């Protein structure tokens, strides 16, 4: 499909420039799966759209409820990017490659509908009903990224399962919806806890 082809074309263009014009510069590309986590309010993204529907008490429109996406918590993604940046600094020539960051467990394959159902269980606020519409453009039913290079070269793998990523994300947005919690403090505490987990696993 055009979406997937565009990603492959981007990698070909980066590789061509890296080898042809930037031979003295070491460039890596990084691509993550479908990222969820507190603090995201972008439009046309499933979790922010869900939170807006709760605030506005309006139906949530889902285009592809049965499509599977590689869901990943934002802290797992950022940790991977930091590891890649460190590797580029330490071993620039060998790190100048294309890296994917995504779940590597098939148990983490959640459909869009399953994500919403999981949030329904975790959020303390009632979720408005969902409306299903046909997508205007073709989209793949099943998207997955191969993160084996990041696993092998950066020793990276996601700390969170999809269920845990949903739990952490729902907790952050619960705090946001209550309007009585210091979100900066909550975010810093989440980062600190995440780093404690990574340090204990290393």
Residue ranges: model-predicted function:
Residues 1-11, 44-48, 70-71, 109:
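Short-chain dehydrogenase/reductase
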Residues 1-2, 23-46, 68:
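Flexible, glycine-rich beta-alpha linker
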Residues 1-31, 51-56:
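Active-site Tyr-X1-5-Lys
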Residues 5, 22, 42-45, 54, ...:
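A generic fold-level signal
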Residues 20, 38-39, 91, 157:
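Histidine kinase transmitter module recognition
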Residues 54-202:
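C-terminal substrate-binding subdomain of Rossmann-fold SDR/epimerase-dehydratase oxidoreductases
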């Amino acid at each position: 499909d055009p979406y997937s082809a565009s990603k492959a074309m981007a990698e070909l263009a980066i590789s061509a420039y890296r080898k042809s014009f930037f031979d003295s510069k070491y460039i890596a590309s990084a691509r993550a799966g479908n990222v969820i986590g507190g603090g995201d309010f972008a439009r046309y993204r499933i979790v922010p759209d869900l939170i807006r529907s709760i605030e506005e008490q309006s139906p949530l429109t889902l285009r592809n409820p049965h499509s599977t996406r590689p869901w990943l918590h934002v802290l797992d993604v950022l940790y991977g990017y930091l590891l890649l940046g460190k590797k580029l600094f330490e071993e620039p020539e060998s790190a100048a490659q294309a890296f994917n960051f995504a779940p590597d467990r098939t148990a983490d394959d959640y459909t869009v509908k399953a994500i919403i159902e999981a949030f329904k269980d975790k959020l303390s606020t009632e979720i408005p009903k969902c409306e299903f519409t046909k997508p205007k453009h073709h989209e793949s039913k099943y998207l997955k990224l191969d993160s084996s290079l990041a696993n092998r070269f950066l020793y990276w793998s996601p700390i969170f399962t999809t269920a845990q990523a949903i739990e952490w994300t729902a907790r952050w947005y619960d705090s946001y919806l209550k309007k009585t919690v210091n979100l900066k403090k909550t975010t810093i505490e989440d980062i600190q806890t995440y780093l404690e987990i990574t340090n204990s696993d290393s």
